[in-house]
């Protein structure tokens, strides 16, 4: 599981997508595409962004929900929190001494 998170975070485009979802959750593919183009100068196809979103979903960093014909994407910080907690736990540091 952490390997999927690190793989997802390794790509700068996926980090931009996560930044955009952190700024405004619940975006459609069209909205994400427009924000990447205007704010980051990334003119990408819908298919390319969909592939990036699929990697983020596999790592559980993004959750999707459907409303009618539309699919909305939300940031899920739980995988990052699990990794950070594991590394920052004070009892884990004491065990290693």
Kindly give the residue locations of the regions a language model identified.
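Compositionally biased, intrinsically disordered low-complexity regions used as flexible
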Residues: 4-5, 57
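Amphipathic alpha-helical dimerization/coiled-coil segments
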Residues: 1-3, 19-23, 76-97
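N-terminal helix-turn-helix DNA-binding core of bacterial DNA-binding proteins
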Residues: 7-8, 12-45, 70-80
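Short, hydrophobic-biased segments on the C-terminal half of alpha helices
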Residues: 53-54
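Beta-hairpin "wing" of winged helix-turn-helix
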Residues: 57-67, 74
